[in-house]
Each structure stands twice: as C-alpha cells, then as structure tokens.
C-alpha cells in the first residue's frame, strides 16, 4: 500500500523513499487515526506529501515542547537555522527536511507556509499560559493556524481558494480547544496550564483544583463549557470541505468527524480527563473511516486520480 503511493507520487530515489518511509512511521505513532485516514482516503499521489508536512510539523513541535526551556530554545534555534538554510539552498541531509523540500517542489505554496510557521513558532516555546481568551486567540493565530496550514495547503492545491484560510482557522480553533481540554492531564504534569485564567475565574475553579484532579460541580461545569465550545466550533468548520477538490473531501470530512468523536468521548469522560485523555471507541473510528473510504472510492471511480 505504501510503496504504491510513493510510486504514484513520483518518489523513486532510494534515499528519498527511505526518508518518506521513516517519516511515515513517525506520523503513524503520533496520530494513528489520522495516519490511516491519509492512507485510505487521500489520492495516492498526495499521501506521501501529507506525511512529509505532518512529520515536519510534529518534529518541530517536539523540539518546542520537550525538555528544560534553555535546551528547547537552543534546539529550536538550531533547527530553524537548518530549515531556513535548506529552503534557501534547496538541499539538506536531514531525513525530515529532505522530504519537505521534495514536497515543496511539487506544492510550492508549502514553502511559504513553512517560512510563516518558522516566523512565529517560538510562540509555543515562550508559552506561559493565557490570561484571557484574547491571549488564546493570539496563540491560535501565531502558532496553531500556521502549523495547520502546513498540511491544509496541500489539500487545496494551486491558488488558495477565497475564504480558505478563515475556514481553516475555524477548524483549528475547534481542534485546539479540544486538544487543550483532552490533554489537560499531560499538560498539567508538565506544569503547563492551557485554560485562560479568566475562564477559570468565571467558573470558580483554581489551578490547584485541576492539578489535584478535584471532582467538583465547578470543575465539571468548566469542562462541559470548554468541550461545548470545541464542539460548536468544530461544527462550524464543516464548510471548509467544500473549498477543497472533490478527491480530498472524504479526508477532510473524516478529519472533522474524528475530532467530533473525540469531543464526545471527552464529554463522556468528564472530570476523569484530569487524570488521562479520552479516545473514541475503535468501532466509532472504523465507522468514520469506512464511511469516508466508500465516498473516496466513489469519487475515484468518477474522476481521474490526478491529484498530487
């Protein structure tokens, strides 16, 4: 299955095929459901390029998130320099950057989004929490959206459709809100509080309530409200599907549906989110993927598979 996608994408060089395959393994561990969606739902020529962009985003995110701040800052500075040099010269010996450059040669808009992402990625490095909802919105614009556009630009090839960036922002707003609630246990363990202080105050919840996993009416109401915001925003993101080519729509629908299923699982879990994250049941995931796989097959039977 994977080798046919490399062939369809015109990736024949043995070193480059090995690089793409290594990044595939990284993405499969990082986001297994989304990885399956890439393989099952996207046109074969596009799948390796989505893997390359996702792997770059994840590698950068790991450098920003893990370890003491001085080490993270030094690692990101070195990484940014290496990536910018590769963008300037068109060559690299790094197994994450080589596939990115190859994908950028096929999808030139990606390289502009890589530069935009690098311009503001240190926002995550400098993260100290949000005082207000406005602070969260700035984080969304400076980090979450540029990161998502690394992959979203591949789903709408050619000139960017009118309204596409705004539609992507709506989706990533809902997705980020969900992640911040669903990852509370992990983030709190890393002394990282992602809920705005004014939101905590309005619900009468303290950071200690969350760190100590207190199951109180106030905490339950807070979690319900946060997940309601995520659910509402994800529901508003569905129009983005109409802005990508028909061959890519099953993947986009599945992406939103997987997030909505995770939101439902998190809602059912309630205050237990303070000790571990929620995941949709396997039958739910399979139902989403199989439904959109049928849709993808119908599209491919009615259109020539030329995306990529």
Question: Where are these predicted regions, by residue range?
Answer:
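Catalytic cores of Mg2+-dependent Asp-rich isoprenoid enzymes
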Residues: 1-175, 181-308
């Amino acid at each position: 299955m994977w080798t046919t996608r490399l062939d369809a994408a015109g990736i024949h060089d043995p070193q480059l095929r090995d690089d793409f395959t290594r990044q595939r393994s990284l993405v499969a561990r990082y986001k297994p459901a989304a990885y399956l969606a890439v393989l099952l739902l996207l046109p074969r020529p596009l799948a390796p390029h989505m893997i390359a962009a996702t792997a770059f985003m994840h590698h950068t995110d790991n450098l920003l998130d893990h370890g003491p701040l001085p080490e993270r800052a030094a690692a990101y500075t070195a990484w940014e320099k290496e990536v910018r040099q590769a963008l300037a010269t068109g060559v690299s010996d790094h197994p994450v950057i080589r596939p990115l450059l190859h994908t950028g040669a096929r999808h030139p808009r990606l390289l502009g989004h890589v530069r935009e992402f690098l311009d503001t990625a240190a926002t995550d490095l400098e993260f100290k929490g949000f005082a207000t909802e406005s602070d969260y919105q700035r984080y969304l614009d400076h980090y979450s959206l540029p990161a998502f556009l690394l992959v979203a630009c591949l789903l709408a090839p050619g000139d960017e459709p009118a309204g596409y960036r705004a539609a992507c922002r709506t989706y990533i707003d809902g997705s980020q809100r969900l992640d911040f609630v669903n990852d509370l246990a992990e983030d709190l363990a890393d002394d990282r509080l992602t809920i705005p202080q004014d939101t905590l105050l309005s619900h009468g919840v303290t950071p200690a309530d969350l760190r100590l996993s207190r199951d109180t009416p106030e905490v339950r109401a807070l979690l319900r409200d946060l997940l309601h915001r995520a659910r509402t925003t994800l529901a508003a993101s569905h129009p983005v599907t109409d802005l990508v080519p028909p061959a890519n729509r099953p993947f986009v629908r599945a992406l939103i549906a997987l997030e909505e299923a995770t939101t439902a699982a998190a809602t059912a879990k309630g205050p237990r989110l303070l000790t571990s994250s929620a995941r949709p049941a396997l039958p739910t995931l399979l139902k989403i993927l199989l439904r959109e796989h049928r849709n993808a097959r119908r599209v491919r039977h009615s259109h020539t598979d030329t995306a990529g």
